[in-house]
A protein has these predicted regions:
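Cys-dependent protein tyrosine phosphatase-like superfamily
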Residues: 1-124, 137-226
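Ser/Thr-glycine-rich phosphate-binding loops at phosphate-binding pockets of nucleotides
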Residues: 129, 133-134
């Protein structure tokens, strides 16, 4: 994992560099996970274009997009708004089930991965904080690559490290918000992984569930693994 440093976008990270169970490594420059790209300078945007960015998948709802447009929805980038709800957990222990609701949203998830399969160049996918909806997509990509579960958990947990100042401010400004909102505890991703593994025997079974062809699965795996 390598963080892409921007002044305003704190949780933008390349999924490259993770070791896999078969002794390989995930590719740099294929997939970027991110919180909402906003307030970026022309220099920062140009740097992404020079890295090969060609496609942006914005996972936010239409209401979220209208409230805060994605700064990367520009000429030269293929922008897709595939609206997925993050759910509304009432308690922290509800989070893993909310993540399962995301992966079981067959139509939307199939669209996400079909865009990735058909894209040429680097793909950036984002939601608002870049940790829940984005974290679920990142987990699926890393699992497809054969990345160790410990690294999948670490990739999820580090979101809070980069977002903690914004999250603290959110709670100061909204004191009635439940304390768990904004966090990215490893235990929540671990429980989600357990739910996922009990539902699907292997990651290929999940992509079969989505209706992704075997050729499509191979293309996606080849894009993320060296």
């Amino acid at each position: 994992m390598r963080r892409i440093v921007n002044d305003r976008v704190k949780n933008m990270r390349d999924l490259g560099g993770y070791p896999t169970l078969d002794g390989r490594e995930t590719r740099f420059g294929s997939f970027i996970r991110s919180n909402l790209p906003t307030g970026m300078s022309n220099v920062e945007i140009d740097r992404l274009l020079k890295m090969g960015l060609s496609t942006v998948i914005d996972l936010r709802t239409e209401t979220e997009v209208k409230r805060k447009p994605n700064i990367l929805n520009i000429r030269g980038i293929n922008y897709f708004n595939i609206s997925i709800s993050a759910g509304f957990p009432q308690r922290e222990e509800d989070i893993p089930n909310c993540y399962m609701d995301i992966v079981l949203n067959r139509d939307k998830m199939r669209l996400v991965f079909e865009v990735m399969i058909n894209s040429k160049g680097m793909v950036l996918f984002n939601c608002t904080a870049g940790k829940d909806r984005t974290g679920v997509i990142a987990m699926l990509l890393l699992k497809l690559a054969g990345v160790y579960d410990d690294d999948i958990l670490a990739d999820y947990e580090v979101s809070y490290t980069y977002l903690r100042d914004e999250i603290r401010l959110m709670h100061v400004n909204n004191p009635d918000l439940p304390a768990f909102l904004g966090g990215s505890k490893m235990e929540n991703m671990e429980m989600f992984l357990n739910l996922f593994n009990s539902k699907f025997k292997c990651i290929d079974d999940y992509f079969d569930y989505l209706g992704i062809s075997r050729d499509g699965i191979s293309v996606l795996r080849e894009r993320i693994v060296l």
